[in-house]
Design a protein with these regions (language model features):
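Intrinsically disordered, low-complexity regulatory segments enriched in Ser/Thr/Pro
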Residues: 55-88, 93, 239-270, 274
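Short, compact, well-ordered microdomains
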Residues: 82-110, 267-301
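Intrinsic disorder/low-complexity detector
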Residues: 7, 11-14, 19, 64, ...
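Short, structured secondary-structure boundary patches
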Residues: 233-239, 299-310
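Negatively charged, low-complexity tracts enriched in Asp/Glu with abundant Ser/Thr
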Residues: 2-52
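An N-terminal amphipathic alpha-helical segment
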Residues: 215-255
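Well-ordered, non-membrane alpha-helical segments in soluble/globular domains
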Residues: 29-31, 195-200, 269-276
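Short secondary-structure junctions
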Residues: 45, 212-215, 284-290
Length: 310
């Protein structure tokens, strides 16, 4: 896996459309299809962020059928630029160059600055408030599943009802962006495929085989067991780990997986358990399980280095 340009054959970007669909690590061909497809009601725009996401670094395009394409890209504090283009394929080529970070990708286009307005003056929170919220955000960053938007909401809400003054939205955004970039810099030194990525491969294989496999699913075991059946029709079985399990793995412990069938049979649960263990071993992970349908499957040892997405 290579960070920065292309990942496993896909562009190192996440594309989100007005239609509510999100596409992660799309190919250049798929990105072209997405650009060509916008323009209708409820589907006018597409926003691309890098993987991992970087604060105020993105590219976006807006289009209404019959009109030009409005293409914009932001370079963090270095500027925000836009241009009007007539051809969807030209837009797709530019976005692909942006995604690959090709030198000179933006050449040949007349870019105009986009006015960002005055910069907001954001006061610093108290030291106690900052330290308390930082501890919470760092813990969630180690888990690795939250987006910057989710983390910002968590930071804003964390002190509500406490004796300390809660962070404002702007304070929360600034704190999260700073800690996010620290984690991005840390993970840039990681080499090769990490254990969470091996886990994802195993879960993808299980899901493709008819076993509903979900990562970081619900808050706890009880909620997971109550909700997993609604995730997919016609599944042969399920496996998941919950958010508390993620936190435990990120703290250096093993990861408990919960599994079973939908017919209430111990034989089905045991059979699904064996399939889960086989998929994990095929991916290169180790497990502890005695074969009992009453016991969870524990993935360990586990080095929890989950790369951020955004």
């Amino acid at each position: 896996m290579v960070e920065g340009m292309e990942i496993d054959g896909g562009l190192a970007v996440q594309a989100e459309g007005e239609n509510g669909q999100t596409h992660t690590r799309v190919s250049a061909e798929r990105l072209r299809e997405l650009v060509r497809g916008i323009g209708g009601a409820g589907d006018h725009w597409l926003v691309l962020q890098r993987i991992p996401d970087l604060p105020d670094v993105f590219a976006q395009v807006w289009h209404e059928t019959g009109g030009d394409y409005r293409l914009e890209h932001r370079l963090g504090d270095e500027g925000f630029f836009g241009a009007d283009l007539a051809d969807a394929d030209r837009v797709a080529d530019l976005l692909t160059g942006w995604a690959r970070q090709e030198p000179g990708w933006d050449m040949g286009v007349t870019w105009e600055p986009v006015d960002l307005g005055p910069r907001e003056d954001v006061p610093e929170p108290s030291d106690d408030a900052r330290r308390t919220v930082e501890e919470c955000v760092r813990r969630r960053l180690r888990c690795g599943y939250d987006t910057r938007a989710v983390l910002t909401q968590i930071a804003e809400d964390h002190l509500v009802g406490s004796a300390m003054e809660p962070l404002s939205r702007a304070q929360a955004e600034r704190l999260v962006d700073r800690l996010w970039l620290e984690r991005v810099a840390e993970q840039a030194a990681w080499e090769g495929v990490t254990d969470p990525e091996l886990l994802t491969r195993a879960f993808e294989a299980l899901d493709a085989s008819g076993i509903t496999a979900r990562e970081n699913f619900t808050c706890c075991r009880g909620c997971g067991l109550a909700e997993i059946g609604a995730e997919r029709e016609g599944a042969r079985g399920f496996v998941f780990f919950h958010q508390q399990g993620t936190e435990s793995a990120a703290a250096g412990h093993g990861l408990a997986l919960y599994y079973g069938g939908f017919d209430g049979s111990e034989d089905t649960t045991t059979a699904v358990g064996h399939e889960v263990v086989a998929a994990l071993h095929a991916a290169g992970l180790s497990t502890e399980w005695d074969g009992s349908p009453a016991r969870s499957i524990v993935v360990e040892p586990l080095d929890w280095r989950k790369r951020l997405v955004g």
